[in-house]
């Protein structure tokens, strides 16, 4: 433990809190271009083929982002908008792709929670 004299000379530094989605640079969303679209498997207790895309952002960073919902139309060179938010069972996936924006189509035949998946109101 430091002495009072040491604390006077060099006071305690507050801990710096880092953002969980640093590559967005304090923006709510960022635009990017898909460089690779593929599926990956989740961590131990779960089993699935999760759809993810590697995205090069406008600020130059490359991030892995999750494609939510059933079916998608993304391929290489698709322009997408990403938001923060990790996927708990996919290590390294800290971003989500927004559906129904730019080149990404909304989820077809979606009836509940439509706004989260960019789906229009069914007639």
Curated annotation (Swiss-Prot):
MF terms (GO), sorted A to Z: rRNA binding; structural constituent of ribosome; tRNA binding
A GO cellular component annotation in the UniProt record: small ribosomal subunit
Modified residues (3-methylthioaspartic acid): 89
Bias type Basic residues, positions: 9-21
SUPFAM superfamilies associated with the record: Nucleic acid-binding proteins
Annotated stretches, region: Disordered: 1-30
One of the GO BP terms on file: translation
Keywords: Methylation, Ribonucleoprotein, Ribosomal protein, RNA-binding, rRNA-binding, tRNA-binding
Subunit structure: Part of the 30S ribosomal subunit. Contacts proteins S8 and S17. May interact with IF1 in the 30S initiation complex.
Record's function text: With S4 and S5 plays an important role in translational accuracy. Interacts with and stabilizes bases of the 16S rRNA that are involved in tRNA selection in the A site and with the mRNA backbone. Located at the interface of the 30S and 50S subunits, it traverses the body of the 30S subunit contacting proteins on the other side and probably holding the rRNA structure together. The combined cluster of proteins S8, S12 and S17 appears to hold together the shoulder and platform of the 30S subunit.
Protein family membership: Belongs to the universal ribosomal protein uS12 family.
NCBIfam families linked to this entry: rpsL_bact
Protein name: Small ribosomal subunit protein uS12
């Amino acid at each position: 433990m430091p002495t009072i004299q040491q604390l006077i000379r060099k006071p305690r530094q507050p801990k710096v809190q880092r953002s969980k989605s640093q590559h967005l640079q304090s923006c709510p969303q960022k635009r990017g271009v898909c460089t690779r679209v593929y599926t990956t498997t989740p961590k131990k207790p779960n089993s699935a083929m999760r759809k993810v895309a590697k995205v090069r952002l406008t600020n130059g960073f490359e991030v892995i982002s999750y494609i939510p919902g059933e079916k998608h139309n993304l391929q290489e060179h698709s322009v997408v908008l990403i938001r923060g938010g990790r996927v708990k069972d996919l290590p390294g996936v800290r971003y989500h792709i927004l559906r129904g924006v730019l080149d990404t189509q909304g989820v077809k035949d979606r009836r509940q929670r439509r706004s989260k998946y960019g789906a229009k109101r069914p007639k």
